[in-house]
């Protein structure tokens, strides 16, 4: 049993008696030199590290032979090693305190020098009372090489083992009796240095003993610079010595190992000497093994998990070697007369096509996988299959522009999904304006959906650049039509699309002129500016020579000249392209703004795009100081009717044409009114009730946007103004309002357009005024008004009314719309004294909650609010 290893420091005040340590660790008296193998001789197995200790791997360096006087050695055999003795001429043997009886301290071991090793789980060396040979047993790891170094450590408690390099070989004045040609010397700390900054042990390899024995070798250890953080050192010029990285003070373990256990360092050659000025460095253990960086981590008490990331690579390498040697293969593929022998499991794991094919072949043959299968493929090139198999067995392959298409075609056909992604990723990086349409056609032909959508989106996004290339003039008619007719074609002006169509026809007029009308039909002619339409399109010879083309141009002219009839002219050509800035937007029209206690009217018209959360200005109102008007959208146009200006009730109707961004007068209403409601049913605009010249009016009329005519319909049963009106389930509903007495009218009135009849019910639950109404998911929502924050929900099927969630703000004279399945309440005023609200809030039916949204351009109330599709020019 080995002796107890104590951590306390011990002073050996006298040297040890010289004694001989045999290879097996027993004591002898015939020699004062320890025995090792000099050049290929036997090794001392007793130098193995004790259990629980991490050996200290050292890369040998070469020291010049110091100029010291030779002294005779007690043994002349090849087992002699270099002995380090004190420079003192006399050797005095004294008894050191704490040394057991019979053990004397060698005169070659200086005072305060102790044997040291480094445990695997500590960052400082622990000390032992035993010399190196007493730390071994004969049964400890027999046959182990003598490369484990004995470290002589001073008794300073602040020494920490690390590795670093120095420019010149250090020296030390104390003498140590060492066990191996490689020694490690730990310098002592200066007295003024604190223990928090550790120093490094420098490791050096002594040359083999010369033919004439030396009496002593003296190495002086100079003062060493302190360090605070790991720093890489320069690579030594010596062969076999690599770069050394100095570990930080928080390094775990002995600071010498960063990877797998290293083999013993090669012994130094006798003839090798350290060049003058060459730094001596320690090479760190390498991790570039066949298996890469291996990892061993603790997963429990007494349990460790070993991970070798390089294992799959090595397995593939071995399988590939077997494939090339046709060893253990069980599948033969014959393509174009060439035979390829592979492993069924390997190929089936990468290709769903071959997996299914192998399964069916095994079932049909009834071999049960016991005999080698043979598959003959006639729809594949042998070179392509060879490349695919190379990828399957190695995981790497060189792809270039020459083979990318054929590889992708084969990988897609045989369902090599991983390789398909590689090819798609390669081709994605190769997409340009000059080849994207060709890649698009190729992806469509081979049914590679991922590449198809990628190339399509790329080509649509850079249409102006693609239109300038020659490739677009060479694609087929069907591909050309599919490309330019797409709603997502990114173009700032439809004129560019028209010019591209004309260029494609003129590329080969003999065969393409017959498609002129078909191609012109995909151009959004109504979005071409009227002046360009009259001056350029009308004068094109291709257009003049085709009656069908002239009809398309005339349709665009009518669209510009008859804005009120656009509702009946809805075709694919009148639909704006989405990528050109067309979106469903919320438009705020006019209204009132409160500045202190003073109100003023607004003529500004703005729209909010929820896709990018931006506000855009539109054409301002063509009048000033008008209020209590009603606003409704029909198609993509906005109709503003009635109102009061300078105390005069008006019957004017203005139409905002979204395409041209301007306001135009249309036919007037037959009855002037303000504070009325307007809505759209079956393409016609209805104006309901309101406040006329002589008080409340029950008059109802509707406007035909095609004929630009108004006609009267059945009047309201109860004349009201400032009511809430909407369309739901084929009926028109009017909720509450203000009656002729100036009080809230608790009445619900409904109108059936097909029969031109009204009905009404009175209910105390309906007493709203100054509140809007909208329809969402078959329910009618009445927002704010006299109830401020309240939301009232009416179910037309059941005929009941219930309370909904309150809004975040009290809102009178607000407006509301429905967009993308949500209700948006905009602006309003808290009370008659103000303040006006400059924000919006949205109702989410799935959560039944209201959410505040970013602010509007300014606080506003008594304004109009509608939703249209707006063509917004970028920039």
UniProtKB/Swiss-Prot annotation:
Positions with biased composition (Polar residues): 115-126
Molecular-function annotations in GO: ubiquitin-like ligase-substrate adaptor activity
UniProt keyword list: Kelch repeat, Repeat
Renumbered ranges of Kelch repeats: 585-635, 637-683, 684-730, 732-778, 779-821, 822-870
Biased composition (Basic and acidic residues): 131-140
Biological process according to GO: proteasome-mediated ubiquitin-dependent protein catabolic process
One GO cellular component, as annotated: cytoplasm
Repeat among keywords: yes
Residue segments, region Disordered: 115-145, 248-291
Tagged with keyword Transcription regulation: no
Sequence ranges assigned to domain BTB in this UniProt record: 329-401
Cited InterPro entries: BACK, BTB/POZ_dom, Kelch-typ_b-propeller, Kelch_1, SKP1/BTB/POZ_sf
SMART domains noted in UniProt: BACK, BTB, Kelch
Protein name as it appears in the record: Kelch-like protein 29
